[in-house]
Every structure is written in structure tokens, then in C-alpha cells.
Amino acid sequence: VDTTTGTPAATGEAATAAQTDVQRPDQHLHLLRPDDAVPPGGHVTILAGGLSHEREVSLRSGRRVAESLRAAGLEVTIHDVDADLLPFLAATRPDVVWPLLHGASGEDGSIRDVLELVGVPYVGTGPRESRAAWSKPVAKSVVLGAGLCSPEYVTLPQSLFRELGAQPVLDAVVARLGLPLVVKPTHGGSALGVTLVERADQLPRAMVDCFAYGDVALIERAVRGVELAVSVVDLGHGPEALPPVEIVTAGPYDFDARYNPGRTEYFAPARLDGDVLGIVREVAVRAHVALGLRDLSRTDVILDQDGVVQFLEVNVAPGMTETSLLPQAARAAGLDLGHLYRSLVNAHVRH
């Protein structure tokens, strides 16, 4: 399959047939098997909170996953990342830790380094691979090297604007990449500091907003098309993509649109024909593998107006809130969230 090509979204009866086709999990997914069951009595510690800009999202994710795991019969403790954490882990020796931390320290590999230092099993990608995925330009470089497509971009540190003057640099950006553009921090999630720039006079304000969340900005050519989020899960049988979720919003898909119910419309599975859905899913799996990710990830892409799947970014700690995309995809696949999360935990239970 050529993962850089595709066809426009199906409509009418064809779209309905395609959605019906992918909603049958036995046809496309082989995620959960009898040997994935976790023995009763397991103790899971969920790390949620932290000090990043995404603290509240992390806490909401932690509560949701804890509810599902408890319903699946596991003992669950939620703990913040603070001075009590390491003594707590030493005293309680949980079977596995699940870091549901978003933003710095949670996704940049730091907390995973610490968990490995103290010998605690955990759900998710390792430290080195997390660091690569956390950096948007590094992740784009890796997936481009793997033969996938991604919008043209440039990275610019804040210091460069002080040294060269902002306007000449921004003029050069527009001359090279054109308009519209997307400005985003090179690190971070939840669309914090992200701006869609339609006119050149909007670019200076977008840079100021971006630099509020980091010292380096990634400016990429904006792509028009169908916005999709594709979650990948690996329970030890190889990575498999859940049904892509189509994201439709009247304005930018910003923080409020992501986490306030009713601001955004989601279609799970996406309203695309079966062949295109397969291509989109393959792109997400290839990105997951190229970056060396483990257990779960979410890849954000756009199916552009030429039918090309454009990689935007990847998340090693996908949100698990009531409006988050991985849970929506799992439900679209007919999967029980408690069983899915329990199976992810089982892969790392302390033996």
C-alpha cells in the first residue's frame, strides 16, 4: 500500500457502508485475547497531575482510567508527581505504574527515566523514544525518513528574533512557506500556544503566544483537509491501529475545543471509505514503529485535498478524558475500556 496517497472521503451510501465495515472489530482488530486477562488483585499506581500546563487534563485522564481499571477488578491508586512519590513506590511496590502525565516531565522521558532507575514496571514508551516523540521537529524528521509525508516547516528559537529582528525573519517565513501557516511550540500538547495564521499581520501575535509555552517555535505550512486522530495499541502481538476519529470544529481545534464537550464534533470511525481508512491506519502504525513507541500512542494526521496523508505529530501519553480520542476510538472498535486498559497493564505486571 502506498501510504502517501489516498482518495477523497466517501459520501452517502458509500460512507455509511464504509463506517459499518470498520465498526466490526472482529474483522480488523485482534487486540484482545484470552491470555490478556489480568489476574485479580493487581495493584496499579496511576501518576497524574504534575506541574506542566496540562496538569488539569492529566488529572482528568487519571480519574477516567482509574474508574475503568477499578471496574475491571484492579486496585488503583492515583498519585501526583511530588516529593512523596518515590517513598510511596518503595513502600507500596505496585505491580505496575501508568504515567498519565501530559506535557513536560510526563512525555519528555524524565519520569520514565526515574521509574527505570527505581526498577518499577510502567505502561508506555521508554525514555529515549519519548524524548524523540516529544520534540515535534525530531518526530517529523523521523517519520519523513521512514517515507511518510509531513507539511513543510521551519523551527525558530526566540533568541533569533532578538538577534535579527522579528519582521525580517517573519517576512522570510511567509515568502518561503506561504499562507496559511500553523505556529506551535516544538514541545507540548493540548494545542496550547498553537495558532492558525491566515494573514501575515497575524504572525507576530502568534509567535508571542507560542513563546509563552517554550523558547522554540515550529512554523509549518497549514494543510486543508480532513483532520484525523489515529490511536495505536500494542498488547504484545504487534501494534494495531484503532478506527481513525474524524475531528470537525467550527473554529480552531484549540484547548477549549478539545476539552469542553459540545465544542467539537467527532466521527468514530471517520467518514472515509474503507481503503482510505486502511491507509490512514497504516500511516499511524508506521509512525509508531519508526519512532520506537511502546504500548499506545496517538498520531494526528490530515488527509489533504489531494488525498495525501500528512503526519502532524504523535503523542506518547494520549489523553483519556471524557472527550479524548483514544477512548472514542476504542468504543468505535467495540472494545471495553476496562478490558483494554487492563490488558495494557498486564503486559508490564511485576512477576
Where are each of the predicted segments found?
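ATP-dependent carboxylate activation and anion-phosphoryl transfer catalytic cores
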Residues: 1-25, 31-32, 36-39, 273-351
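ATP-binding N-terminal substructure of ATP-dependent carboxylate-amine bond-forming enzymes
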Residues: 1-138, 157-169, 343, 347-351
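Rossmann-like NAD(P)H-binding beta-loop-alpha module
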Residues: 146-185
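Glycine-rich phosphate-binding loop of ATP-grasp-fold ATP-dependent ligases
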Residues: 58, 151-155, 180-205, 227-229, ...
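Hydrophobic beta-strand scaffold residues
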Residues: 76, 121-122, 150, 181, ...
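ATP-grasp fold ATP-binding core
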Residues: 143-144, 173-191, 215-224, 228
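Phosphate-binding site of ATP-dependent enzymes
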Residues: 198-282, 303, 308-310
